[in-house]
Curated annotation (Swiss-Prot):
Residues 1-21 form the signal peptide. The lineage of its organism: Eukaryota, Metazoa, Chordata, Craniata, Vertebrata. It comes from the Eukaryota. This is Cytotoxin 5b. It comes from Naja sputatrix. Gene3D superfamilies: CD59. Shows cytolytic activity on many different cells by forming pore in lipid membranes. In vivo, increases heart rate or kills the animal by cardiac arrest. In addition, it binds to heparin with high affinity, interacts with Kv channel-interacting protein 1 (KCNIP1) in a calcium-independent manner, and binds to integrin alpha-V/beta-3 (ITGAV/ITGB3) with moderate affinity.
Amino acid sequence: MKTLLLTLLVVTIVCLDLGYTLKCNKLVPLFYKTCPAGKNLCYKMFMVSNLTVPVKRGCIDVCPKNSALVKYVCCNTDRCN
């Protein structure tokens, strides 16, 4: 019985992510990275002159303010950027 409980515990630990980790797209959305602790937002950065093509994507802790030249879009779910 103890062996069964130990086996179930190990399987649970392996299958579950004990600390939620966010995954954000890199510049090319086919690739993503797992965000380090404390970086709980994904972001996309655009040049205001061309809002259709993002110039940077990744993980961030606080969404930056937009400026006259750069626009940021932030979100908090896996690969949302």
